[in-house]
């Protein structure tokens, strides 16, 4: 074992020191951003969104969440257990809504990403792409340090060169670089930092989120790729700190889990209503999706 002696920081360890600003009002701040990437043929692609994205979890990565967020400029990564027919129905509805509002047909769908696991086939992606334009896909795995993840990224990139590929999760520069060179456009940063995640408690694996973002963002940006902070945000200021640390996107789970559009079961306790929130590697999630 090697002990890392450098100070490692989390969101609650720092504050943002103010600086001079040319802005007269917060209303002048442009919160939309256009993200660009190119495939092996050099063809440039892009999408525009407010770079805050609902996590691809059973509670937050729901179709109802995708409808509301995408229409308001935000993003949603659908949880991986949706059938392609359900996603196609969602995209059809969003496209119809966009046309009725005199917007580009992909105005809303560009902000909704699919999710696959490391052992999943590409059938669902193929079925959706037959019917609609798909902007991005998340390759989701609890341990982004498995060597076979690199092979999976290469497979997705080879078959779908036009897709914006998000891969995670990692917390160090070396694997960030490896996955980008394999074909990833964006890395999800964070292990054990999520509200529903018990990785740190059960295995002792993880890294303070702010330091992870800083280092991984530096590595990714040198290769013209992006990073997505995933986990650890409990209050709005944490989102601000993640962006200041270099995150291009911020993924939210717990902060959205109580919304009406979230998928958790509602229950009442001491006269107050709550929604169930669970991690995707939890016993509850495994029993729900795999029996």
Give a label for each model feature.
Residues 82-102, 119-126, 141-165, 170-181, ...:
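Active-site-adjacent beta->alpha loops and helix N-cap segments on the catalytic face
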Residues 1-27, 182, 204-229, 233-291:
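Alpha/beta catalytic cores of nucleotide-metabolism and tRNA/nucleoside-modifying enzymes
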Residues 56, 116, 141:
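Short glycine-centered, acidic/aromatic-flanked micro-motifs in structured strand/loop junctions
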Residues 8, 71, 130-133, 159, ...:
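Alpha-helix termination/capping residues and helix-transition junctions
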Residues 1-113, 277-280, 288:
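N-terminal capping/small domains of soluble enzymes
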Residues 44-54, 104-115, 134-136, 155-171, ...:
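Short beta-strand/loop segments at the ligand-binding rim of alpha/beta enzyme cores
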Residues 71-87, 136-146, 185-203, 233-266:
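Glycine-rich phosphate-binding active-site loops on the catalytic face of alpha/beta enzymes
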Residues 65-66, 123-131, 165, 171-189, ...:
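Catalytic cores of alpha/beta
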């Amino acid at each position: 074992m090697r002990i890392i002696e450098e100070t490692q920081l989390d969101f609650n360890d720092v504050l943002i020191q103010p600086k001079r600003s040319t802005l007269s009002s917060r209303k002048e701040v442009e919160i939309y951003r256009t993200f660009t990437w190119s495939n092996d043929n050099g063809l440039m692609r892009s999408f525009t969104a407010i770079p805050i994205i609902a996590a691809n979890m059973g509670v937050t990565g729901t179709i109802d969440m995708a409808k509301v967020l995408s229409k308001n400029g935000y993003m949603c990564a659908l949880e991986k257990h949706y059938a392609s027919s359900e996603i196609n129905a969602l995209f059809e509805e969003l496209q119809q809504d966009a046309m009725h509002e005199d917007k580009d047909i992909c105005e809303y769908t560009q902000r909704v990403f699919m999710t696959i696991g490391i052992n999943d086939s590409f059938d669902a992606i193929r079925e959706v792409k037959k019917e609609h334009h798909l902007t991005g896909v998340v390759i989701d795995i609890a341990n982004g340090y498995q060597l076979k993840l690199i092979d999976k990224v290469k497979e997705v990139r080879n078959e779908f060169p036009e897709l914006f590929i998000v891969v995670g999760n990692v917390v160090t520069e070396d694997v960030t670089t490896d996955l980008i060179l394999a074909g990833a456009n964006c890395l999800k940063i964070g292990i054990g930092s999520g509200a529903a995640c018990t990785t740190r408690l059960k295995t002792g694996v993880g890294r303070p989120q702010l330091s992870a973002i800083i280092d991984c963002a530096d590595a990714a940006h040198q290769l013209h790729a992006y990073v997505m902070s995933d986990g650890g945000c409990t209050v709005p200021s944490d989102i601000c700190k993640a962006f200041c640390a270099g995150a291009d996107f911020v993924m939210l789970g717990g902060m959205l889990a109580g919304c009406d559009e979230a998928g958790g079961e509602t229950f009442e306790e001491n006269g107050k209503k709550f929604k169930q929130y669970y991690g995707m590697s939890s016993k509850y999630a495994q029993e729900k999706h795999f029996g």
